[in-house]
Amino acid sequence: MSDVKSVIESGRAVLGIEFGSTRIKAVLIGEDHAPIATGAHDWENMLVDGIWTYSLDMIWEGISDCYSKMAQDAKEKYGVTIKKLAAIGISGMMHGYLPFDKEDNLLVPFRTWRNTITGEAAAELTEVLGFNIPQRWSIAHLYQAILNKEEHVSKISYFTTLAGYIHWQLTGEKVMGVGEASGMFPIDSKTRDYDAAMLDKFAALDKVKEYPWDIRDILPKVLTAGEKAGTLTEEGAKRLDVSGNLESGILLAPPEGDAGTGMVATNSVAVRTGNVSAGTSVFAMVVLEKALKAVHEELDMVTTPSGDAVAMVHCNNCTSDLNAWVGLFKEFSELFGMDIDMNDIYGKLYNNALTADKDGGGLVAFNLFSGEPVIGLNEGRPMFARKPDARMNLANFMRTHLYASLATLKIGCDILFKEEKVKVDTLYGHGGLFKTKGVGQSILAAAMDAPVAVMETAGEGGPWGMAVLAAYMVNKVDGEPLEKYLSDRVFNGEKGIVMQPDPDDVKGFDEYINTYKAAIEAERAMVKALPL
């Protein structure tokens, strides 16, 4: 403890703060990268005039409350007041739209990534640029405002994301980490900067030429992990620490997005690695050796914090339907007066699923509480069906629902692995699906036909990943790449428990997916038949 105290007192600790959609979290780490103090502030987006937003006041109240709780935690644990830090890093939800005029006034309320209001712009830009531009990307928001002839557009001097805005206010620097920038505008992984040819194509659009600004001048400057991104100003220090104890002059890392910090937190920034986060929603991110051959609307292209290309498959639904069925079995046990721990119920049901027929026995389930763009559905209805000759038993039932939780992810990833022939050495699994040891892991390995590792220490998540990126900036030696720093100095060679795909499981999941795809028409009919 005295060691930690001296690390804080001498200003050697590093701080990461991440703005999630419901929680802002600060993690302070020591020289071994382990968390030593944390603080959190809950917040909720608001729907104002049909736009999902957070006010600027909410941002600053949130970050100062979060910081003061972290500082209080450090004081209570170690009896020390934080005055200096080795480095700070800010991360947040990617994408969205924060445009400012030349006097630095916000021109319209912050439009977050949740707003699906840019369909026309996203489709047109995808065609013009020959690159998939999802609706939540900043450039789609800007172009939609142009198509809508919104009067604020002519006044834009700078536009940025949430993390980019906070970093700018703390340092005065209009910069951004490459991973975060890749959610604003496409990145060229060779130059680790915005794609020059695509900038030219955007600037040449007739509707864009009507405005006085050049797209290159209003985007943030791109930096890669390890570069210095400015220092905390006196004004910035006061905004972060309202008690006035924190000194100015602290180095800041390039602000990053939640995708990049998640890659760092799971040690999956190296080429041919990836990570799968499976909870209420599910996504897979795979670091590519080279650019993809074709444009796929199912795949979002972003980058690691170092600028390597990453393909991402994001699905809205994962464990909610599974959890509902497990809850039903809990109720059944209570009818018999049994008080069984939920973890035991999950354990028994999930492990029993491993004894099932490899294809699920002819049962099929859709776990869709909401729409799923990967299979072309704007809405979803949870649904379970079977053929009359299907082998209906508990093991097949549970295996079918485990398959269903990853079915849309598999359809998206099959494009990556089967059509694009992308190779992956290891996928790191994290999230609720992997809580029951070995089960979610083996189902994911079957879905992806790839080795899946689960860390014994499920990482501390995004804010910790951001703190690690800030530590990398101040600790790295010349020429030390981020992936080496993570493997050697942060994860200390820990590879986690790796599970290879079982060929019979892979074949079984492929057979299940064929049934699932054939039944998508029934799911579509169900959405129509049961309107909300």
Predicted region positions:
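Carbohydrate-associated surface elements
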Residues: 115
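N-terminal glycine/serine-rich phosphate-binding loop of ATP-dependent small-molecule kinases
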Residues: 1-108, 123, 155, 216, ...
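Electropositive nucleic-acid engagement tracts
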Residues: 208-211, 215-217
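Active-site core segments that coordinate phosphate-bearing ligands/cofactors
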Residues: 2-11, 15-16, 82, 120-176, ...
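Generic structural signal for well-ordered secondary structure
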Residues: 52, 56, 60-63, 90, ...
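Short beta-strand-loop/turn "lid" adjacent to the catalytic site in phosphate-handling enzymes
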Residues: 75-112, 132-134, 167-179, 183-188, ...
